[in-house]
């Protein structure tokens, strides 16, 4: 009886030692992007960007991102993907989501954010990984901003490599990699 009481007290003490932030972060999903340039592992912040994270995870789980490309890459800025095939055919996304750019997360190097049009609530499937600090994309800097919803935890060297590939224009699209950089698969890690 003494052993079980002691074990229970130790468990309660251990749980109380964890901060709420640490407990929340423990449940944040990780997503692996397997690309033709290497792997990128993302940690998504479901506490600060629940709508964007759920949206991204839904696209991942449906297989939407498989065989899409990083269709816009700009050195010293970002790499954008999640919407086009290798033939630059746009995939049909789900309806747009609410912009969560006011969540306190910043567009710093290594973060992932939702791409959108000039309409603040127009983000669908496309996302970008910042390869530099891009404070001008943050909430309130020039407009509502671009919603950060996670960060690269492994493979930032791959994102940097992708940002340096040669590009050209394809019809109305600029900064398209000359040789497609393909997201072969995207999956939520256990």
Swiss-Prot record:
It is found in: Periplasm. Its EC number is 5.2.1.8. Residues 1-24 form the signal peptide. One of its GO terms (biological process) is protein folding. One of its GO terms (molecular function) is peptidyl-prolyl cis-trans isomerase activity. Residues 27-188 form the PPIase cyclophilin-type domain. Disulfide bonds: none annotated. It is an enzyme of class 5 (isomerase). Keywords: Isomerase, Periplasm, Rotamase, Signal. The keyword Signal applies. Inhibition by cyclosporin A with a Ki of 25 to 50 mu-mol, a concentration 1000-fold higher than that required for eukaryotic PPIases. The keyword Signal applies. It holds the Pfam family Pro_isomerase. It catalyses: [protein]-peptidylproline (omega=180) = [protein]-peptidylproline (omega=0). GO terms for cellular component: outer membrane-bounded periplasmic space; periplasmic space. Transmembrane segments: none annotated. PPIases accelerate the folding of proteins. It catalyzes the cis-trans isomerization of proline imidic peptide bonds in oligopeptides. PANTHER family: PEPTIDYL-PROLYL CIS-TRANS ISOMERASE CYP38, CHLOROPLASTIC (PTHR43246). This is Peptidyl-prolyl cis-trans isomerase A. It comes from Escherichia coli (strain K12).
